[in-house]
Curated annotation (Swiss-Prot):
pH and activity: Optimum pH is 7.0-9.0.
Organism whose genome encodes this protein: Escherichia coli O44:H18 (strain 042 / EAEC)
Location of the active site: 127 (charge relay system), 155 (charge relay system), 258 (charge relay system)
Thermal effects: Optimum temperature is 37 degrees Celsius.
EC number per UniProt: 3.4.21.-
Broad enzyme group: hydrolase
Site feature location: Cleavage: 1095-1096
CDD domains: PL1_Passenger_AT (cd01343)
Protein's name in the database: Serine protease pic autotransporter
BP GO annotations: proteolysis
Free-text description of this protein's post-translational modifications in UniProt: Cleaved to release the mature protein from the outer membrane.
Pfam families tied to this protein: Autotransporter, Beta-sol_PIC_HAP1_IgA0_2nd, Peptidase_S6
Molecular functions per Gene Ontology: serine-type endopeptidase activity
Organism lineage string: Bacteria, Pseudomonadati, Pseudomonadota, Gammaproteobacteria, Enterobacterales
Amino acid sequence: MNKVYSLKYCPVTGGLIAVSELARRVIKKTCRRLTHILLAGIPAICLCYSQISQAGIVRSDIAYQIYRDFAENKGLFVPGANDIPVYDKDGKLVGRLGKAPMADFSSVSSNGVATLVSPQYIVSVKHNGGYRSVSFGNGKNTYSLVDRNNHPSIDFHAPRLNKLVTEVIPSAVTSEGTKANAYKYTERYTAFYRVGSGTQYTKDKDGNLVKVAGGYAFKTGGTTGVPLISDATIVSNPGQTYNPVNGPLPDYGAPGDSGSPLFAYDKQQKKWVIVAVLRAYAGINGATNWWNVIPTDYLNQVMQDDFDAPVDFVSGLGPLNWTYDKTSGTGTLSQGSKNWTMHGQKDNDLNAGKNLVFSGQNGAIILKDSVTQGAGYLEFKDSYTVSAESGKTWTGAGIITDKGTNVTWKVNGVAGDNLHKLGEGTLTINGTGVNPGGLKTGDGIVVLNQQADTAGNIQAFSSVNLASGRPTVVLGDARQVNPDNISWGYRGGKLDLNGNAVTFTRLQAADYGAVITNNAQQKSQLLLDLKAQDTNVSEPTIGNISPFGGTGTPGNLYSMILNSQTRFYILKSASYGNTLWGNSLNDPAQWEFVGMDKNKAVQTVKDRILAGRAKQPVIFHGQLTGNMDVAIPQVPGGRKVIFDGSVNLPEGTLSQDSGTLIFQGHPVIHASISGSAPVSLNQKDWENRQFTMKTLSLKDADFHLSRNASLNSDIKSDNSHITLGSDRAFVDKNDGTGNYVIPEEGTSVPDTVNDRSQYEGNITLNHNSALDIGSRFTGGIDAYDSAVSITSPDVLLTAPGAFAGSSLTVHDGGHLTALNGLFSDGHIQAGKNGKITLSGTPVKDTANQYAPAVYLTDGYDLTGDNAALEITRGAHASGDIHASAASTVTIGSDTPAELASAETAASAFAGSLLEGYNAAFNGAITGGRADVSMHNALWTLGGDSAIHSLTVRNSRISSEGDRTFRTLTVNKLDATGSDFVLRTDLKNADKINVTEKATGSDNSLNVSFMNNPAQGQALNIPLVTAPAGTSAEMFKAGTRVTGFSRVTPTLHVDTSGGNTKWILDGFKAEADKAAAAKADSFMNAGYKNFMTEVNNLNKRMGDLRDTNGDAGAWARIMSGAGSADGGYSDNYTHVQVGFDKKHELDGVDLFTGVTMTYTDSSADSHAFSGKTKSVGGGLYASALFESGAYIDLIGKYIHHDNDYTGNFASLGTKHYNTHSWYAGAETGYRYHLTEDTFIEPQAELVYGAVSGKTFRWKDGDMDLSMKNRDFSPLVGRTGVELGKTFSGKDWSVTARAGTSWQFDLLNNGETVLRDASGEKRIKGEKDSRMLFNVGMNAQIKDNMRFGLEFEKSAFGKYNVDNAVNANFRYMF
């Protein structure tokens, strides 16, 4: 296309001459054609002395791919990337691109010879006289040059394009122009990069050159040093390829690079700017490049010359009327008496069209004629409405809406023409009927709100293309444009569904910049019914068949002339044999004959390409985001659907019905070299992709989460197969080119942990679903009639898991860690190198705290060598373990975690099962091949067990359950500081048999007696059998609290018979005071409830004196808290309502009434915790004498519903009902010290009846019981109150304070405890306390009163810490 001026020595002139490249369109021409052009322009006398050569020369010790990626912003060279390392082919660091963020070269044309500096203008050198068009981005759109704008005196031009470029952002232009030495100032200009497409060479350190490719094959780029000369020309020496001053990626521009840009990073403006275009070089073996600096004044003038006078709309004068004469190419915009002349296309001269700029708020334009503006565009500085008279259209270079503007466009376009839209403002399409034109938008917002015509037809555009990553298109409704005609070009843009339901049958997305979103509050429904494929097939090339054999591309068309006839064949293999002898043309494995009709042969290839596309997977490179649900029905032909972009639907559901769905990362795109694919399955560098949605719904589907993909979503699976961490992957061999997707399927296994896929969420499996986990996993699994297989070493179950009729297998290096409990009605299996860890739940914001968790399964099968089961950090696991292979079982930890207090009922239950240990297991271990270790752990034998070795530290092994005795057989036992608890019925016992070796010390051997031996009964029951020579000190008799007793067995060691045996002789038992005290405290909870009600019996008296009316209704609420020894505390809320009637007798007011009460109380202590809900009712009578005396009588019945959990003697939770009766009498006398001050002595007596209760249960295998009989408390109280009344016109308030002594006259009920060691009786005691109270009673109106009282007590065994009583009374 172009040729840098080459300086050659001419013997005729005796000096250097500039040998020019008279460029033509030769991108695909041969060097011979280029040489011919050159020969025509060079004096013949000089040809024998000057070499015709062209090159872009780079270092040979750096991979050529680096230079290619640099030029196309691929690989590591993403715009904005910082401190990019550059390595040589041996992996040694050459240097870093650390002086500036990576430049964006998208403004450079696809062929590298020009750069976009304004939406409609490019810059290059004027000696590039042959090129007529340019393209940008992935090169899918071509822009024609309508005016070359050649500079009159320097080698520079700034061509104008026919349309506004929508794919890319123009490059910023230097603000310093040709200022002397401007670009030598390294404090401001910190880096210089270039890009070009000349013939490619590499150079070694000895200067040897190797040709890589011809001119214009592709672009390369690199660094250059600080200019040696900087004025109108920049001169530097990038040809000194290994000189560090030129940076780590020197790139010497040479013939073929004419017009290519030189960029500089302007640190002051914090952006890259184009400063110059390449003009000349110093020969292939030289080092110097010459660039012409951008003449900014000239450039600005060129652009300014293409504007007509600006149009300023004046409000109140009516719309701007736009008339246009197509013949003259001129038009007029008029408002009132003011006119503006505009220029449009004249004949075929697009450049005759000038740009128009509109200002004036809320402007209005009416097209009276169709306007053909050629290369002229419209720019709106303010908001406008543009409409047209019926059928009138507008065409031109495009529309720019400035930031903050909203232009309403009511004008339809022309078929075959696209409206190009730029600018940060909004363009609202609001025409009528069907607009046959298309839209290409590169910035801002376009709202499609086309209105229906009289026939109901709507089409805002025939097609929509979004590019550059900046634009948004908003759908007014679902009929605005055929979704299948929406495409996303280079870097894409956002399609906002705006709450509409939209169906795509194909997705045309060039890259990750393609976004489908919904920003509306109304949820959109997106249906991806991807049954259509691209039917545009390029004309296939026809290769020639070599008679001597060769290689080719299977599926391509080839020809050969035989007997003067051209025969056409389709190649079936990558290589073929000789066609002269052995004739490979007859081999169906190598060739398929498709006739001698060229057109039919070509059509056959096209048809097969289309047939292949019908089966090809669908790959979507873009993004789905926002408020929407996405549905993907089965794709015809069994085509798979692959997302290697991203999904972000936090409140949305993505559903797949049948077929295959794959979420995966995206291979990093690299620049192609000589036709190489931009991506491959075996490349190491992949981009991570994130997939987030509320729910992924799968039905009869096959789902894969593959490498470099993260999925954050719940999954609902119905008869589907889920593979997390799949090695299945797809690449698009046309990725980054904008061409039709060419998928390649294969496997790709990540090399690093960061490249592995990961999942977070909860999965529900139903109806024969299958889940294979090979990725990092965090979340929960509920499986019903399904199967789960784990091979990932990083699976974390953070939610409770449920497996019903479902299998769970961990194998091949898989590691399952469960943190929140698990249920399974089947066996969990650990295969070879599989590990299962059962743990408590980590407490948030703590370093080492865990809440207990329960694991209930039918069992665990350790079936493969090196299988492992770990129960640790607050986990309680139940279910037998069977080890059929050499495996390990770990219970507890030598570095145990701190167990947190329970916050949930499940956690509290789990904690109670641990019995103070760090971890617990309940079940048998069989198979004889497991190595078991215990640290601070509890093992409750659920059956006979056989293991290879057992290491026990600070742990306990006990046997419980039915009355069947257990035998633990172990080859090697190593126990220290541990407790072994065995049961006996005085005839048989649980046993421990050690067959090979027993070591250890400080172990306790405890016995749980299922029956109580008779006094003096001698036993002779072997408990432990170990090999001869085992130390007799390994086990000693231990004391164990069982029930309410401390039980110590009596043992002797027998070393006869070739074994060492520990034999049980009998036991000693004594009462355990702590356990008995806890039991007594639990049984006395009824007394505390009784006292709560007692303190509520007499709280009505302040309401009655001096009341008006014959009857009254009242309500009160009392809230309080109390405490006692043993960590006891309670709190209660008491609600009481009543109704009474007043009887006025001689000298006395008698009130008789009825009351209903409800009390909600809770209690907690070292021994128990629980709640009581009480309801009751009663009758009362109160007599108030005029003398000041009073008598109050009450009788009440209360029913108590109790729910308490005891933490002693394995009591557990008990739910029981009790009741109580109350009969109370109170009397007192109010002495008035003054008219408004009084003192009131009081006396009260309460007699009651509290029902007894009996509990029977087992602690281990020991029968226990607790009982207390009905008892009748008698409580007295004496005290005095002092009060004063404050009165106003319509109100009065009586304040009072008092103290009293409350005391028991009878002992509380007796508690009887019984266990295997006998019966223990705990007699009830008396209690007393001092009460203090302050309060007030207010008369609000004649018939309303309100009272408030505070109370507490001291000096008692049980005290009221605080109580608040509020009452309200209404008289009528």
